[in-house]
Amino acid sequence: WVSKQDAGDAKMQELAGYIADGAMAFLKAEWKVLSIFVTIAAVLLAYSGTIHEVNGKPIHSSWIIAISFIIGAVFSATAGYIGMKVATKANVRTTQAARTSLKQALKVSFTGGTVMGLGVAGLAILGLGGLFIAFLNIFAGLGVDTVKTAIEVLTGFSLGAESIALFARVGGGIYTKAADVGADLVGKVEAGIPEDDVRNPATIADNVGDN
């Protein structure tokens, strides 16, 4: 629904395109670093997981915890991608809608935010529910407390999702402030032009950080 709204004139769409491209470039750069962290963390979890004794034989659930961690990280990154995509689409459409009425602008912006909120909740339920059912079936024939063990290994999913969200939040915050200060120094201090002026190229980076 958000994508179907009026995106404004050619100049607005051009600027929105620059911001969207910058946002995707930021995500790709962030994912490269996070993929290294996820790989190292998953290996450590695989070697330091829980061992269950079943009929005198050790049953290692550590590798399942590591897989849960990776799946949680992927789901969290997917939620971030969806949110960034929708945000960059909703921005320019909210601006165009504000030219007609405040009600329409609020509707477009609120709907764009709703997509992210429901996307996070939906992916969390899908991931936790799907893995819980899968783990119940995996541990069913091993002679262990299936529910307890399934919940135990699900902590890997939560850890993966929270880790990516934390790094994305902190990394995005640092980028936002760096871009904001840089744009202000170059624009207002050196060039003497207003804040967020289209003549300042750093404004694009500033708006990427705002997303």
Where would I find each of the regions flagged by the language model?
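Hydrophobic, small-residue-rich transmembrane alpha-helices and their short perimembrane loops
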Residues: 1-211
